[in-house]
């Protein structure tokens, strides 16, 4: 089975969030089911610079404002995965963030940049590469939302049955919304600009295009699949998603054990397993405390946070609750960037309590590994969270997740309540209500369990035994593919 994945990010070449981890890990995981995956990406500088031994597949005349378009075929470095890169310098050759300028303003021509991505995907589905034609095209998030629309448009124009499409929602809150006037530049049938198409409250929505035109929709956890059909979490698209509930699947993301594995992680102070976790984490914790200038206290309960500093991620709650940690002798290490006001608040807290709070603004993949390995608790207090990968990394490293009961967090972490401790299912700390009070109670439960060393070790062992790799999830995705291919034959 041949599957083309269409996305804007791919770890380790380009990453701004969890999307890159998923698009990198899913194709190799699917290979064990006989799926021949290839990936199509925009020619951002990171991709152009990373790929070696590329071959020119085709040159395409000017389109979507791009003066020159070359499609290259290469290998994703250090993998067996083939990658198509759209080299269109006038659209993609921009430094820094792939979506926004140095002032963090979204590029005004993003609709053209990602229209080209979708249009090229449709051409590949028709046989642009004479040696490889996909049976399924699987697009990811709003950047690739037009892929199913262009494929459907091609089917309508030719009268021939097109390849089947799958669209994955990684985060419904980011929708790719543009003024209605841009539709004329997208080269799509006029009938697509309607409620039964791209139109969304007087705007054009790339996300809605994917949701409406894809044959099947997946999102990244069972709970999130239910939540996005509700007014509270549907971001205005709950009606469409509810109408398509029979085509909507919630499939948890997984962890790539080649990258996130305490037994062989070269980025952490020492490797460890579930049997050596006590000594291994103690060494990682000391190394982290030394690196971040914290007091070197083995018995201090250390909370790690690796996140974007936004309201969605619950950081406004943490601002109010952080005193609960320091007043009890705990420590906090935070890595992230985002809202400038939140950055300043956390930097001020670190300046006031330099031996208890350490803050690093920005994102550093290596440091993320060190924080997750060296912390006792990893905090993910998100207001909403489609899946979340950080808590899965925490489970893998024996770093107990403290999470809000929402989305994929609710699906993957079991609270250390008395009954869950009794039956051996507890893996972390879960708070139900998105409030400072509820978060504070969860923090207090973490301290209480930490003081009961035998119980803490049991929960940590249970956490590390959780099956959070891609094996099970990849099989579910494969079954969706298989059913679609069967429909097309």
UniProtKB/Swiss-Prot annotation:
Signal peptide: none annotated. Pathway: Glycan biosynthesis; glycogen biosynthesis. Pfam families: Glyco_transf_5, Glycos_transf_1. GO terms for molecular function: alpha-1,4-glucan glucosyltransferase (ADP-glucose donor) activity; alpha-1,4-glucan glucosyltransferase (UDP-glucose donor) activity. Keywords: Glycogen biosynthesis, Glycosyltransferase, Transferase. ADP-alpha-D-glucose binds at residue 15. One of its GO terms (cellular component) is cytosol. Disulfide bonds: none annotated. GO terms for biological process: glycogen biosynthetic process. It catalyses: [(1->4)-alpha-D-glucosyl](n) + ADP-alpha-D-glucose = [(1->4)-alpha-D-glucosyl](n+1) + ADP + H(+). The keyword Calcium does not apply. It is an enzyme of class 2 (transferase). Its EC number is 2.4.1.21. NCBIfam families: glgA, PRK00654.1-2. HAMAP family: Glycogen_synth. Synthesizes alpha-1,4-glucan chains using ADP-glucose. Belongs to the glycosyltransferase 1 family. Bacterial/plant glycogen synthase subfamily. This is Glycogen synthase. It comes from Francisella tularensis subsp. novicida (strain U112). The lineage of its organism: Bacteria, Pseudomonadati, Pseudomonadota, Gammaproteobacteria, Thiotrichales.
């Amino acid at each position: 089975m041949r599957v083309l994945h269409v996305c804007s990010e791919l770890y380790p070449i380009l990453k701004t969030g969890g999307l890159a981890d998923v698009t990198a890990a899913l194709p190799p995981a699917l290979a064990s089911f006989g799926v021949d995956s290839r990936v199509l990406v925009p020619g951002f500088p990171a991709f152009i610079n990373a790929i070696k031994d590329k071959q020119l597949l085709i040159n395409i005349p000017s389109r979507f404002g791009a003066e020159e378009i070359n499609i290259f075929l290469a290998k994703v470095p250090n993998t067996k995965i083939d990658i198509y890169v759209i080299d269109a310098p006038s659209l993609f050759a921009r430094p820094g963030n792939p979506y926004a300028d140095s002032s963090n303003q979204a590029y005004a021509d993003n609709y053209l940049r990602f229209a080209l991505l979708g249009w090229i995907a449709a051409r590949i589905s028709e046989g642009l590469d004479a040696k490889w034609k996909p049976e399924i095209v699987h697009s990811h998030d709003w950047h690739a939302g037009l892929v199913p629309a262009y494929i459907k448009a091609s089917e309508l124009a030719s009268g021939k049955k097109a390849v089947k499409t799958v669209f994955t929602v990684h985060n419904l809150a980011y929708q790719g919304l543009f003024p209605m006037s841009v539709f004329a530049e997208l080269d799509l049938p006029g009938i697509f600009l309607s409620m039964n198409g791209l139109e969304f409250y007087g705007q054009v929505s790339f996300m809605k295009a994917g949701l409406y035109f894809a044959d099947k929709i997946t999102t990244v956890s069972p709970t999130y699949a239910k939540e996005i059909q509700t007014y509270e979490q549907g971001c205005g698209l709950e009606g469409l998603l509810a109408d398509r509930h029979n085509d909507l699947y919630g499939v948890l993301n997984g962890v790539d054990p080649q990258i996130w594995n305490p037994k062989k992680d070269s980025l952490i102070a020492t490797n460890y397993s579930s049997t050596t976790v006590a000594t291994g984490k103690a060494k990682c914790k000391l190394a982290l405390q030394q690196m971040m200038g914290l007091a070197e206290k083995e018995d201090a309960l250390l909370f790690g946070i690796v996140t974007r500093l936004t309201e969605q991620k619950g950081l406004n709650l943490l601002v109010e609750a952080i005193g609960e940690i320091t007043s009890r002798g705990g420590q906090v290490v935070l890595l992230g960037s985002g809202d400038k006001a939140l950055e300043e608040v956390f930097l001020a807290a670190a300046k006031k309590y330099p031996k208890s709070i350490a803050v690093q603004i920005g994102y550093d993949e290596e440091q993320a590994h060190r924080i997750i390995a060296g912390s006792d608790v990893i905090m993910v207090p998100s207001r909403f969270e489609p899946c979340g990968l950080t808590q899965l990394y925490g489970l893998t490293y024996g770093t107990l997740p403290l999470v809000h009961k929402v989305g994929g967090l609710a699906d993957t972490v079991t609270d250390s309540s008395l009954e869950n401790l009794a039956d051996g299912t507890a893996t972390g700390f879960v708070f139900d209500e998105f409030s400072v009070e509820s978060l504070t109670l969860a923090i207090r439960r973490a301290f209480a369990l930490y003081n009961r060393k035998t119980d803490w070790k049991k929960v940590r062992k249970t956490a590390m035994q959780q099956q959070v790799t891609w094996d099970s999830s990849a099989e579910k995705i494969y079954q969706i593919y298989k059913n679609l291919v069967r429909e097309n034959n």
